[in-house]
Amino acid sequence: MLNQKIQNPNPDELMIEVDLCYELDPYELKLDEMIEAEPEPEMIEGLPASDALTPADRYLELFEHVQSAKIFPDSKTFPDCAPKMDPLDILIRYRKVRRHRDFDLRKFVENHFWLPEVYSSEYVSDPQNSLKEHIDQLWPVLTREPQDHIPWSSLLALPQSYIVPGGRFSETYYWDSYFTMLGLAESGREDLLKCMADNFAWMIENYGHIPNGNRTYYLSRSQPPVFALMVELFEEDGVRGARRYLDHLKMEYAFWMDGAESLIPNQAYRHVVRMPDGSLLNRYWDDRDTPRDESWLEDVETAKHSGCPPNEVYRDLRAGAASGWDYSSRWLRDTGRLASIRTTQFIPIDLNAFLFKLESAIANISALKGEKETEALFRQKASARRDAVNRYLWDDENGIYRDYDWRREQLALFSAAAIVPLYVGMANHEQADRLANAVRSRLLTPGGILASEYETGEQWDKPNGWAPLQWMAIQGFKMYGDDLLGDEIARSWLKTVNQFYLEQHKMIEKYHIADGVPREGGGGEYPLQDGFGWTNGVVRRLIGLYGEP
């Protein structure tokens, strides 16, 4: 496993008198024995050991030179290049010629690397097609077939076909794929559902978790844990029986809870935080604390404006990417200033709701298999998590779920992430009713629901609306009997996407929905992307439920 399994702290060692090193806040007691600054890469089962390295690991100062020089407009381009020869030979050649007066960095890169392949398709959008027809015709365009592993490439080969989001994203992404699968099921593409189910199970078997995406530079983190929701979808659609995935679900759970048994109150390790009352909740995390390969220059620039140690900023930027909400006011100490990012100090409401679903799924499938002890254990875990969420993340005064700043011991900002407890059935009916009132008054627009009520310039904030948030809100409110609000969000979102499609003949990653006139969503570290996997998936599912807009 790469950068995933760190030696658990020995409980006996925690009792030894040692000098504690406080980093900004005494609540997170970081023992040197407990957390390493950067875990060493370990061999990934099924891959050559040399392929466990990221491009930044491999090319060292050459990587930094290329990214600093901005010879490609997108920082993701160079990490996605494949070397034409052994990387060590490339690095040796670079060190020999880099100080020559006539050295041309771009030519050097072009001579020694294959640039990322631009996927060519014969598909041309037909303005006469309905939205449903357009989406169904896009599935083959966004499908990638399995291929042999390219030596020293950052791309991790998968055994089966998969869907990519589109645009700059030429690999599969974990939580994106669940929402894409909703549409595949509606389109009758059980073949692709089976392939993607096999791929995610394979990744859990080989890496111990589902990484952010199938790139080496994504292996040090995951994304929102939605595999339990995928398994539920497979069962509903008759693609695969849920029982066959029980071991995979347990393995994913072990990844998210690693180190929990050794923590004392007010202490954190990787993804787990032991709260003051002894309960366990989770946070987003990345095992590396260096600039992201795919956004290297952006991360370096952000750290320069932080005032905090760069490695802390890098860790929090990476953890923000693991959240899927990269980036949002949710993770910022000062809204509107990315350099104030503090992702690892927040207990996110959506993450803990997804983990509640995972615990519940393990209990339910264990019951089907007659494993009574496992069922009882995980029902207790799910119940304990719900109780802890209600104690720390439920704002009873305002009737909303909020993230919790565990180091400052205070509630954080309100966002559309608050609807995830409804989607996974973790809330009670009073909480659902009160949350519905808050969403109506604070997030609902004629175009759908906003990611948050704060306008910061980050892409997961106002004025943007995102397909997965619409879907979870629609289904969540309807699950608790509020069909009126659920239907209103659904029809508003369908109208937004269809109106934009009629004008632009394309589907996009996010939409500006704050003023009732759908436009391209802004913000973020990269240009708006077309495609787009999860938008297609959610809209195709909604068309099946509500008809063409």
Swiss-Prot record:
Q: What does this protein do?
A: Hydrolyzes trehalose to glucose. Could be involved, in cells returning to low osmolarity conditions, in the utilization of the accumulated cytoplasmic trehalose, which was synthesized in response to high osmolarity.
- Identify the residues that bind substrate: R168, W175, D176, N212, R221, S222, Q223, R292, D293, E294, G324, E525
Is tRNA processing among this UniProt entry's keywords?
no
Sorted alphabetically, the keyword list is: Cytoplasm, Glycosidase, Hydrolase
Output the lineage of the source organism: Bacteria, Pseudomonadati, Pseudomonadota, Gammaproteobacteria, Enterobacterales
Question: How the protein assembles, per its UniProt entry?
Answer: Monomer.
Family (UniProt): Belongs to the glycosyl hydrolase 37 family.
Q: What is its subcellular localisation?
A: Cytoplasm
Put simply, this protein is called Cytoplasmic trehalase
Gene Ontology BP annotations:
cellular hyperosmotic response; trehalose catabolic process
Alphabetized GO MF terms:
alpha,alpha-trehalase activity
Under Enzyme Commission nomenclature, its number is: 3.2.1.28
One matching Pfam family = Trehalase
Catalytic center at which residues? D326, E509
Q: Which InterPro entries match?
A: 6-hairpin_glycosidase_sf (IPR008928), 6hp_glycosidase-like_sf (IPR012341), Cyt_trehalase (IPR023715), Glyco_hydro_37 (IPR001661), Glyco_hydro_37_CS (IPR018232)
Q: What is its main location?
A: cytoplasm
Catalytic activity annotation: alpha,alpha-trehalose + H2O = alpha-D-glucose + beta-D-glucose
Instruction: State the pathway, as annotated in the record.
Output: Glycan degradation; trehalose degradation; D-glucose from alpha,alpha-trehalose: step 1/1
Q: Which GO terms describe its cellular component?
A: cytoplasm
